[in-house]
Structure formats: C-alpha cells, structure tokens
C-alpha cells in the first residue's frame, strides 16, 4: 500500500531551511534524451497541522516580474544631462595654475585620464577605484571627451601604469616646484594599510591615527600658500630626517637655490640643523621648550633690553634676536650612531664651534590672551569633571582624564573620590610662557622671512587635514599601485588646497569652504538635445563663488576640451 500523500496531486518534497519547512512539487520530463527536473514552490509546510500553507502570490517570481514591468519606463537617451558647474570650476582653476599643462608635458596622452580621475575624486568619491558614478552624473566625461570607462578594473590598470612611471612623476614634480621661489614647507604623516604592500607598510608602536594596522609614511611639500608641490612615499618606520635629506636631494636636482625649507618642531635637533646647513640650505623650525638653551632664552626675554616691536601681517610682536650655536657633543651619539650636536648660546664654552644659527624669541599679546583663556577653561573643566569621579582607582581615572595637564595639579584619593588642587607655581609657570614662541633659523634668515615661513608651515598641516578627509586606509596590494593612487589623490589635493588658499586670501573663510563651493557650483547643470545645448539657471551664490575664486561665470556648455592649450606647449 502506497504512503498517503499530503496533497491531492504529486507527493511534495519537503526542505528544511532554518526553522521553517518548505514544500515543493517535483516533476520531470525528457528533453533530447535527458531527464530534466522541474521544481515548483507550494508553500510552507506546518508539521502540527500536517498542512501546506499556501504561498503569497504577491511575492512569487511571476508577480515580481509583472510588477517590475509596470514600474519600468524608457530612459530618453537622446537628451544628455549632467552636473556641470563643479567640473567647469575645477577645469578653469587647473588651467590657471598650469596643472593640466604640467601633466601633459610629463605624461603625454595618459595625462587626460589622470586629471579626469583627480577631478572626479574631488567632486564625488573619496576612493580612487569608485569614481565611475561621478563620471556618469556629471559632465566630466563629456567635458574632456573621455572614452575610457574608468571603472574599478580600468583604474587598477591606470594606477599600475602611473606607478611604474616614476621618471614621469619626478618630471611633473620638477615643473610644479618651479613656482617655489621663497619657501618650501615639508612635513610627514602616516597612513594605515590593510596590506603590507611588499614591505612598505609596517607596524609602529605609535602612529598618528592610533590604528592597530600597518602604516606607511607620506611626505608632502607645499609652497607658501599651502598648495602641494611634491609628495614622496616611504616605509612606515623610516626616520623623519631621512625624508628631509630626500627633499634636499630633490631641490638640488630641480635647481632650487636660496629657498627656505620650513619644518615642524618635531624635526628640531642639533644634528638635524647641522645636516641642513652643511648642505648650504636655509631653514626655519619652531623651537621646543624642552631644550635647555630655549628655556634660558624664554627666561631672558622678560628682562631683556634688546626686545624690539616688529610688525608682520598688520600685527605687532615683541621680538628678541639671539645667536644660537652648534657644538659636537662629547657625551652622546645620534640615534644612527653618528655625531650628535648640542645648541649653545653666547658665553658658553665652545659656542658656535661647529656652526652658527639664529633664534628669534617672539611674544604676541593676542596669543597670550587666547592661551590664558583656553588654559583657564581647561583647568575649570578638569576640576568639574574630577568632582564627578566615582571609582576604585580615582587617581588613575583623573590622570588619564587630564593627560599632560596633570602636571598642574596635586592629586590624591579620598575613598572612591579624588581631591585635586592647583600646584602653587602652575599658574605662574604657564603665564610666564603664554603668548611666546621661538623660531630657530639658519644664520642668513631675517625675522620677517622666518614669520612668512612659519605661517606657511601651518598651511601644510591644513593640507594634511584635507587629505585625511579622503579614504585613509588602503587595501592596495603593492607599492606600484599605491604610487599611482597617490598621484591621482595628489591632483585632487592640489585643487582642494588651491581653492582653500583663494578663499582664505579673499577673507571668506567664515562663509565658504571647498565642499560648499563644489556643491553649490554643481547646481549648474548642462543639457544637450541633438546639436542644441544650454546651461540651467545660475544662482547668486554661484556668481559669488566665481568672483571669489577668480573664475568667469560659465556662459556655454563645453565638450571635448583638451586639458591645456596644446599649441602653447614647448
């Protein structure tokens, strides 16, 4: 006797998935001598009632297909549309700074793809391999007449090609550095990577983003306006001063003479200063108070009769100039085993025996007021937060909370609470140092030159801030593609910093930023039907942006442009 069936038709096939049992009707037929199985879904089988719950007709494949057909519409492809204003703005700016021209002279025909990728990266997507959507919704592809898809596969091939062309990259940098007649600012940072990139990325005990992944190092050179001119990639653990030696080699190769190199205070040491002046290069670095000679200079400043009021950028500073010498240390060596050098002041034994520098001690009343206000707010905030601590280890909690500021407090436990009091000399010590800074320079740098360089160094940090808005973690498998990716990102960063500089120079920082400029300009669209093309309406905001950035208001739709005036190329 056959088994009873659960339905009146064929015996269903039951399949368990998760906590549900699904029923199917399985049949077969012969086709070209082969057996073909056909499965039809019946519904969910309920073992308690021994019944099959009918399927939801609204969710079946046929229903979905019919619903999709009802929602479908024909895309009118004989009318072309796209965001135009942002593309137009960036093209006008890159022409003004000869970016496309330098790319064309360095890379030839592939330069158009490099510039297009950099502009697309800036407008739409922070990831190099995902710029295709930006090309589709903007006028960028039509603007330059780009045929390549620039999808992920194309970008992989492009970055590989660029990365292999280091000589072309160096030629491009040489053209960009031609404008650096007065100041070059240099700094380094680390970037995280999920791959070791053939040993380039390395684990560091400390990195700037506190990431538990391998890091590689990037050095960036900018001009006095904070616009990038050159980048270099290094292993993550490389000593920062080695990157400066590479920069000085580049300056020699590019024949940049009498240019002041500006570095962050992290580069300051007697040996580093000695290395730079031995290369016959001028430099400026902020001083660090932990050096004994600089503490002495700060102490001497208040009672000095050699202070003079100096004006820079419509601001008055009190300035004391002092000789600063270098002398080889008899008691220690540098980290690489070479000779170390100590700073000396006039009157010290052996002063200036191995080189002479300058130190400018500067005092700014406005900075003093700002720093005192910030200091008092910090003290008040920590005192308030200390009162809310309730822990088995209250002193440890407060120390972690206060960080370096713990040096201003006397701290002791009171049960689960913590008692904090200001140290007697804490306020006096901070007040005596507030508003003051020291600039260390080579012997032939004037105070006004050192201040110009000091301002420019701050703009280099802002350039890094722009770069960190992008994808900071890399998954690039090798350093060749990384080099190509960084080149495209460098184009994007150059345009960002140029726009930021123009906004700053127009005193419009409180009203505009780079993102606002691009997004506002992208409200200008382009439409083309057959041979007829036109722009959409242009707002007052867009006209203001064009005025601030020294760009003419667009009046026509442009297509198939070269990235520079090809007839003007040498």
Positions of predicted regions on the chain:
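Secondary-structure transition/capping motifs at alpha-helix termini
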Residues: 32, 138-144, 180, 224-227, ...
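An anionic, glycine-rich sequence signature occurring as long contiguous blocks
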Residues: 214, 230-233, 280-453, 505, ...
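Basic, amphipathic alpha-helical segments enriched in Lys/Arg and hydrophobic/aromatic residues
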Residues: 478-500
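Dynamic "connector" segments at or just before major functional cores
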Residues: 1-200, 219-232, 237, 245, ...
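Short acidic (Asp/Glu) and glycine-rich catalytic loops that position anionic groups and cofactors
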Residues: 135-139, 225-227, 254-256, 430-445, ...
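Short, basic/hydrophobic alpha-helical segments
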Residues: 173, 241-258
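Acidic, metal-coordinating catalytic cores used for nucleic-acid/nucleotide bond scission
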Residues: 262-271, 289-292, 480-482
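Short amphipathic alpha-helical "interface-anchor" segments enriched in bulky aromatics
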Residues: 449-477
